[in-house]
């Protein structure tokens, strides 16, 4: 009786082995601790990755914002630097005075002897010409006459010249007849020197009329432009400081 029972059990085991693929497999319950740990680990890992991604994105936005601000600041500073370095086309009165104070030139435009320059205290070219015609005759044909007011007018109306605006301010303030003699200190002589340099050459004979009005202008002209050979002084102005100054060096000619 035991032998048939053993055979039945063995047969049942073989059948079970075939059904299960030859080896028994271990199956975990639905709520196995291992499964719970795996699910929790996966969720926790995903959360950590999300937080890490947020932390990476936030500094990136801040960096972009800071770069934009820094770029704007650099651009503004660059524009300001260009404005400062950009050549000025006009000068104010204060700026001109600073330029004059900074001038260190000690060499005249025309060394002594290159040109023959004379002053005349007569108020116009016509009057000076008439007086000299009587005393010198045809010799005045070689002379070139310069009226400082006309020189200043030339630069006042010279478009885009750096002194155009400033000269027009004085023109409006003092009028066409006297504004040239009310310019900032040194400006009249400076513009005369510029005009001489642009228009005259070695060997020319020149007479500057209605000039100088002060000893300061006289000495400045001789230091910056050229030495003067003579000054023509109407008799009514023979007592002026300018006449007395040139009398001390034997260059005054009373007419």
UniProtKB/Swiss-Prot annotation:
It is a single-pass membrane protein. Its main location: mitochondrion. The chain crosses the membrane at residues 64-82. It is found in: Mitochondrion membrane. Disruption phenotype: Increases frequency of mitochondrial genome loss. One of its GO terms (cellular component) is mitochondrial membrane. Residues 1-40 form a transit peptide. Keywords: Membrane, Mitochondrion, Transit peptide, Transmembrane, Transmembrane helix. Present with 1710 molecules/cell in log phase SD medium. Belongs to the AIM36 family. This is Altered inheritance of mitochondria protein 36, mitochondrial.
């Amino acid at each position: 009786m035991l032998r048939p029972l053993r055979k039945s059990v063995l047969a049942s085991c073989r059948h079970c082995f075939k059904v299960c693929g030859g080896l028994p497999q271990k199956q975990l319950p639905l709520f196995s601790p291992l499964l719970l740990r795996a699910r929790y680990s996966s969720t926790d890992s995903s959360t950590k990755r999300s937080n890490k991604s947020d932390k990476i994105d936030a500094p990136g936005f801040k960096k972009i914002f800071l770069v934009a601000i820094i770029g704007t600041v650099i651009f503004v500073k660059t524009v300001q630097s260009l404005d400062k370095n950009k050549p000025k086309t006009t000068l104010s009165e204060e700026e001109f005075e600073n330029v004059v104070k900074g001038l260190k030139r000690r060499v005249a435009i025309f060394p002594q002897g290159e040109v023959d320059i004379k002053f005349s205290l007569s108020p116009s070219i016509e009057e000076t010409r008439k007086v000299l015609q009587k005393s010198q005759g045809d010799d005045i044909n070689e002379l070139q006459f310069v009226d400082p007011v006309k020189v200043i007018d030339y630069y006042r109306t010279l478009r885009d010249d750096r002194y155009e605006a400033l000269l027009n301010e004085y023109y409006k303030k003092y009028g066409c007849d006297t504004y040239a003699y009310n310019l900032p200190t040194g400006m009249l002589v400076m513009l005369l020197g510029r005009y001489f340099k642009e228009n005259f050459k070695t060997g020319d004979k020149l007479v500057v009329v209605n000039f100088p009005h002060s000893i300061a202008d006289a000495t400045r002209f001789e230091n910056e432009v050229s030495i003067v050979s003579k000054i023509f002084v109407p008799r009514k102005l023979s007592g002026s400081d300018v006449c007395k100054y040139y009398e001390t060096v034997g260059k005054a000619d009373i007419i």
